[in-house]
Amino acid sequence: MSTQEIFDEWHRREYPSQYIWENYTYPNFGISDDQLVCRLPIRIFNCDNCQLIIDNEEISEIHKSTIEYIVRNQESFIEDIRKGIFDYYTFLWNDYLNEFEDDNKYPNPMNKDAQIIDLMIKPKAIHMAGKIDEGYFGICFNSTFEGDHGLGIEMRNYKVKNVGAESVGFNLHSVE
């Protein structure tokens, strides 16, 4: 078993609430409940694919160009994502995670670099509002340190704007 498979298996056992909707899967490419859902083969943090969710009945040209940019240039913003998550994790660790005394699950981020985040998260969805500006999307992750709520990132112009619970990655607003 690979390290990623071991993490996935452990994460399912530890945080089953994050998988409630897993069996309520949409077709690989289709429309359901006013959302267009398909699989986007994007590799971020050692995950081969994420679910792409667009809150619209069709994919606009801006959606297409944003998706193409993500696929082609993901390496250019992975460090920004990693640093944003690392800063958020450091905040949580200083706030309350250090009280758990479990160095495997909640390693001390002090004197470590942001690469430790790679072992603690796995992307699960890329989310886009119906009408967007180019480069505006959210990424949602399973994570060991935000087990009950998941982890979310709001991206603007392909830069991290906000990191928090999973709702941050899903509560995107359409531009008018």
Q: Residue ranges of each PLM-predicted region?
A:
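Acidic, proline/glycine-rich low-complexity IDRs
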Residues: M1-I31, N108-E176
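Long, contiguous N-terminal structural blocks used for assembly/anchoring
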Residues: M1-Y106
